[in-house]
Every structure is written in structure tokens, then in C-alpha cells.
Design a protein with these regions (language model features):
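Terminal-region recognition feature
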Residues: 1-204
């Protein structure tokens, strides 16, 4: 399920000044350096191999330089590739540093599993954040035997995701499997009640 958000513009806008590529690069580097110093990691957009590598690299780096010290993982994602997401998830769970997760705007699909996988008691959501859980989707081509194999694998992936959410949220496996049958949307309050997050974050 894709949601398109409208971009609102002021009626009168001052013309944008030309960007200096070097200034843009240096500005990005300075922001990045500051966030690393503050042990902040961001997922902004789809979960794929590129974002998975960037996030995993940062988690492992922060663990290496100061093991056991808190990391804050900010999430605004529609979800994406399950295997890429599980690399992040497993890394979060294996390092000694507690990982606090924060839903900034939307944590959908694989993003919701990452959100729920934060350290218990340290999972947060912004006041207008939204969470969506559902079963995995995909498509394929091939022989009937190939399609049967894919269907079996999809079912295994669905059950794995449901079990992770059940364990992280304190829900039964059966309830999560039932909720997976459709796009299941939750606002901030509902996501706390479901157990995906622990607290509403009203001030940074």
C-alpha cells in the first residue's frame, strides 16, 4: 500500500541560490560526523541493500568504538527487502550496545519489525508517527514447481515476521498472523497498545 503525500509550496518563493557541490559535500559530512558522535543512526526511505549496508556499518562502528553505549536508531521507512532488513535486525540484536528505536513518520512493513526490535523500554514514536504491519508480498515467474517453491518460502517469511513481532510486542503468534492478512495501520497510541513501541516521544 503506497501513500502519496502532497508537497505544499508557498505562493511566493525566493529563487534558490546555486548550490556549490563542495559546500554541499562538506555540509553533509559535518552533519554525518555530528550524528555519529551522538551515536544516532537513520533509516530514511526504503530498506534495501544500500541502506542496509550503511546502517549496519554504522552500528558495527559505534559498537567497536564504545561497546555497550546506547545507540539511537531513527526510522522513517515504507519497508522494503526482507533479507536486507534482517541484516539490520540481527545486527541490532547481536551487538552489546542497547539500540533505542524511534519512529519519526512511518514505520511500515519491514520498518515496523525494525522498530519493534529495539531494546525493550527504549522504543519510541513521534506524536504523528504511523506503523503498518502486513504479510510479505512478491512476485515471480517460472515453472509451476518454481512457483510452488516461492509460495512455500513466502509462507516461511510470513511466519518468521509474525513470530518476531509476537515476541517483541507480547502478542500471540496467532493474533499477529491474523493481523498480517491485510495492511494493519496503527497511530502512535495504537502502536503503544500493540506493543511495537513503549513510549510516545514528545520532546527530543
Amino acid at each position: 500500500m503506497n501513500i502519496n503525500y502532497k508537497n505544499f509550496r508557498m505562493e511566493e518563493e525566493s529563487p534558490a541560490s546555486p548550490e556549490n557541490p563542495m559546500e554541499k559535500m562538506m555540509s553533509g559530512w559535518m552533519f554525518d560526523k555530528k550524528f555519529i558522535e551522538q551515536r544516532k543512526v537513520f533509516l530514511w526511505g526504503p530498506v534495501d541493500d544500500k541502506s542496509s549496508k550503511e546502517i549496519t556499518d554504522r552500528l558495527l562502528y559505534l559498537e567497536a568504538i564504545d561497546p555497550g553505549k546506547d545507540i539511537t536508531f531513527y526510522i522513517n521507512s515504507p519497508g522494503g527487502v526482507v533479507t536486507s532488513g534482517m541484516v539490520i535486525y540481527d545486527t541490532m540484536r547481536m551487538i552489546s550496545s542497547p539500540v533505542s528505536t524511534v519512529c519519526m513518520g512511518m514505520a511500515a512493513s519491514m520498518g515496523s519489525i525494525l522498530l519493534s526490535g529495539g531494546t525493550k523500554g527504549k522504543r519510541y514514536i513521534f506524536p504523528h508517527g504511523e506503523v503498518m504491519i502486513h504479510q510479505p508480498s512478491g512476485g515471480g515467474r517460472g515453472t509451476s514447481a518454481d512457483l510452488e517453491i516461492m509460495a512455500v518460502q513466502m509462507q516461511k517469511t510470513k511466519e518468521m515476521g509474525a513470530q518476531l513481532l509476537a515476541d517483541n510486542c507480547g502478542q500471540t503468534f496467532e493474533k499477529v498472523m491474523k493481523d498480517f492478512d491485510r495492511d494493519y495501520w496503527m497511530d502512535a497510541k495504537e502502536s503503544i497498545e500493540y506493543g511495537i513501541v513503549d513510549h510516545l516521544l514528545e520532546k527530543l
